[in-house]
Swiss-Prot record:
Family: Belongs to the gastrin/cholecystokinin family.
Subcellular location: Secreted
UniProt function note: This peptide hormone induces gall bladder contraction and the release of pancreatic enzymes in the gut. Its function in the brain is not clear. Binding to CCK-A receptors stimulates amylase release from the pancreas, binding to CCK-B receptors stimulates gastric acid secretion.
GO CC, alphabetical: extracellular region
Modified residues (Sulfotyrosine): Y2
Organism field: Macropus giganteus
Source organism superkingdom: Eukaryota
Protein's name in the database: Cholecystokinin
Coiled coil: none
Length: 8
């Protein structure tokens, strides 16, 4: 999670 997105 990066600032509420980017879940890799």
């Amino acid at each position: 999670d990066y600032m509420g997105w980017m879940d890799f």
